[in-house]
């Protein structure tokens, strides 16, 4: 089955797995998915990233994080912003702050995929892929 929006598929898989309190989830491997996963790990939303398989069957296994005795998901919400039908680009001054800085906007820039904080520090804008909080 072809997937027309692999980023939305990735976000949905993570959202569903965290709601069911799974410890890991697998997503089809791509450079963009791996870049987004690395940003999520750097920002503390996921615990680990492992790649399995080769070629078109390769998968990325993400370790999900939970907090507290009742295992509340670290990722409360993930929202896709820029979609294949409507791309959203922002310059440095217009980059959004998610929940007043508590959340993260993941930005695809000319220097790679990074969080909104890193993009502001480097003074570059780009395509706003998603919000995570």
UniProtKB/Swiss-Prot annotation:
Listed SUPFAM superfamilies: Ribosomal protein S8
GO biological process: translation
Matching InterPro entries: Ribosomal_uS8, Ribosomal_uS8_CS, Ribosomal_uS8_sf
GO MF terms, alphabetically ordered: rRNA binding; structural constituent of ribosome
Record-level GO cellular component terms: ribonucleoprotein complex; ribosome
Sorted UniProt keywords: Ribonucleoprotein, Ribosomal protein, RNA-binding, rRNA-binding
Top-level taxonomic group: Bacteria
Segments forming a coiled coil: none
Similarity comment text for this entry: Belongs to the universal ribosomal protein uS8 family.
Function: One of the primary rRNA binding proteins, it binds directly to 16S rRNA central domain where it helps coordinate assembly of the platform of the 30S subunit.
Assembly with partners or alone: Part of the 30S ribosomal subunit. Contacts proteins S5 and S12.
Protein name per the record: Small ribosomal subunit protein uS8
Phylogenetic lineage: Bacteria, Bacillati, Cyanobacteriota, Cyanophyceae, Synechococcales
